[in-house]
Amino acid sequence: MKEHEVLANAFAMPLTSPAFPRGPYRFVDREFLIITYRTDPDKLRAVIPAPLEFDEPIVRYEFIRMPDSTGFGDYTESGQIIPVTFYGHKGNYSHSMYLNDEAPLAGGRELWGFPKKLASPSLTRESDHLLGTLDYGPTRIATATMGYKHQPADLEAVKKSFETPNYLLKIIPNPDGTPRICEIVQYPLIDVTVKGAWTGPGALALTPHALAPVADLPVLEVISTIHILSDLTLGLGKIVHDYLKK
């Protein structure tokens, strides 16, 4: 393979059989269980990378079921999203993400900088409630429950919430371990259709784990719980802050 051929095909690793395809990345029947909770402000401050900031010590714990995603297949994800501001503009910062599928794990980290790790999340219907669980190895580190479709949510308000910018901290090292890329990436969710959304009673329990520290942002008070069914496209990102150019 000639040098120009290498460059022409240098989309993802491995060169001759990339772990994920080129986009667009469309998700059909993407289902969310989101529990919004209040946490310790000092602990939250310790994990949000400047120049991102927070107004209120709020975390959204999410379980996401993705049965039909272009190029990524059928998988489930779980993690923590933090409402932030970026120079005064409201957004969402992805703090932790755990999933059970290699293609979106590799693609999420390499393309956008999603903080993805391999684990075993699930989102299921259990009689009269939704059940979200996250296992890291044999250890259960997160359990969420929600009463099933108790009250309809405002679909227009839910769709509007998908327009909020999303932020990631992307880090890729040089071969010697020093940072080659260290930047804040912003990405959108586009072509969103909200098929249904419901609220209801919710509960969330987090268990400490050395390598999956979701409990480091403790649950002090559950504020709200929502269940969403949607179709959407995960848009590509742009660099909005480069730590290495300061």
From Swiss-Prot:
Residues the record marks as active site: 116 (schiff-base intermediate with acetoacetate)
Domain of life: Bacteria
Protein name (record): Acetoacetate decarboxylase
Broad enzyme group: lyase
Organism expressing this protein natively: Beijerinckia indica subsp. indica (strain ATCC 9039 / DSM 1715 / NCIMB 8712)
Transmembrane feature ranges: none
InterPro entries documented for this protein: Acetoacetate_decarboxylase, Acetoacetate_decarboxylase_bac, ADC_dom_sf
HAMAP family the record matches: ADC
Documented EC number(s): 4.1.1.4
Keyword Lyase assigned: yes
One of the record's GO molecular function terms: acetoacetate decarboxylase activity
Catalyses which reaction(s): acetoacetate + H(+) = acetone + CO2
Purpose of the protein: Catalyzes the conversion of acetoacetate to acetone and carbon dioxide.
Family classification: Belongs to the ADC family.
Keywords attached to this entry: Decarboxylase, Lyase, Schiff base
